[in-house]
Amino acid sequence: MDEQEIQRLVEEVSLQYFGMPFLHKAMFNSRLRTTGGRYLLNTHNIELNYRYYEMYGKEELVGIVKHELCHYHLHIAGRGYKHRDKDFRELLKAVDAPRFCKRMINEEKGKKVYMYECMECSLQYVRRRQINTKRYVCGKCKGKLILIKKTS
């Protein structure tokens, strides 16, 4: 799906569910990480997360578009467009738009796990962050720590 297709989709959804035209720009924003989309108050444009389209398909994207169009049309009309406003929640129900988008399935960034062992008492420590073994000692017996295993 490219920029023209997303623009056309937003315009169609706006006419179909809201009965009003969408007169601004809709685009994908690759910098969005944790949100499905956002409505920009200054420019009245809508930005959408392309990864949601890749992961969940067109149905989820249409739901996100409906949610952002609720912000858009209420803001243009001068009514309550924020998530906590009654007008916004009522319009969400009327057009069957989701209040929140699905959670993004995170691509794990290779979680590193460091395992240290005390040379005196053999107590093992599992940490996500590397520690300076010259500076830190065992909390139980004050023995020297050594790195046993590093998994990534």
UniProtKB/Swiss-Prot annotation:
Places the protein is found: Cytoplasm
Keyword Metal-binding: yes
Transmembrane regions: none
Keyword Cell cycle: no
Any one Gene Ontology cellular component term annotated for this protein: cytoplasm
Keywords: Cytoplasm, Metal-binding, Zinc
Domain of life of the organism encoding this protein: Bacteria
Pfam families linked: SprT-like, Zn_ribbon_SprT
Cofactors, names only: Zn(2+)
GO biological process: response to stress
Active-site residues per Swiss-Prot or TrEMBL entry: E68
GO molecular function, one term: zinc ion binding
InterPro entries registered for this protein in UniProt: SprT-like_domain (IPR006640), SprT_Zn_ribbon (IPR035240), Uncharacterised_SprT-like (IPR023524)
Ranges where the SprT-like domain occurs: 7-148
Family statement: Belongs to the SprT family.
Cited NCBIfam families: PRK04351.1
HAMAP family on file: SprT_like
Name of this protein: Protein SprT-like
Organism phylogeny: Bacteria, Bacillati, Bacillota, Bacilli, Bacillales
